[in-house]
From Swiss-Prot:
InterPro entries: Ribosomal_bS18, Ribosomal_bS18_CS, Ribosomal_bS18_sf. The keyword Ribosomal protein applies. GO terms for biological process: translation. GO terms for cellular component: cytosolic small ribosomal subunit. Keywords: Ribonucleoprotein, Ribosomal protein, RNA-binding, rRNA-binding. Binds as a heterodimer with protein bS6 to the central domain of the 16S rRNA, where it helps stabilize the platform of the 30S subunit. Pfam families: Ribosomal_S18. PANTHER family: 30S RIBOSOMAL PROTEIN S18 (PTHR13479), SMALL RIBOSOMAL SUBUNIT PROTEIN BS18M (PTHR13479:SF40). The keyword Cell wall biogenesis/degradation does not apply. PROSITE patterns: RIBOSOMAL_S18. Belongs to the bacterial ribosomal protein bS18 family. This is Small ribosomal subunit protein bS18.
Length: 73
C-alpha cells in the first residue's frame, strides 16, 4: 500500500531499554492530542515494548502525570 494512512515512524526506544512511567516527555510521544495511546502499527514498537508502554501510560495517568483525556483536543 504505497498511499498508506498510517506512516510507520522509527521508535525512539531501543529494544531492551526500560519504559518508565515517570518519563512524561517520552510517553507524550506515544499518545494523541486527545490522550489516546497510539497503536503499535503507528509507533513501530515491538509487542513487548507496546505492552510496557501501555502499562507505563496507565500508571502515569493514575498518579496524575498524564491526563486521562485532553479537553482541548
Amino acid at each position: 500500500m504505497p498511499n498508506s494512512i498510517f506512516k510507520k515512524q522509527l521508535s525512539p526506544i531501543k529494544p531492551g531499554d526500560p519504559i518508565d512511567y515517570k518519563d512524561v516527555e517520552l510517553l507524550k510521544k506515544f499518545i494523541t492530542e486527545r490522550g489516546k495511546i497510539l497503536p503499535r502499527r503507528m509507533t513501530g514498537l515491538t509487542s513487548k515494548q507496546q505492552r510496557d508502554l501501555t502499562l507505563a501510560v496507565k500508571r502515569a495517568r493514575i498518579v496524575a502525570l498524564l491526563p486521562f483525556v485532553n479537553p482541548e483536543g
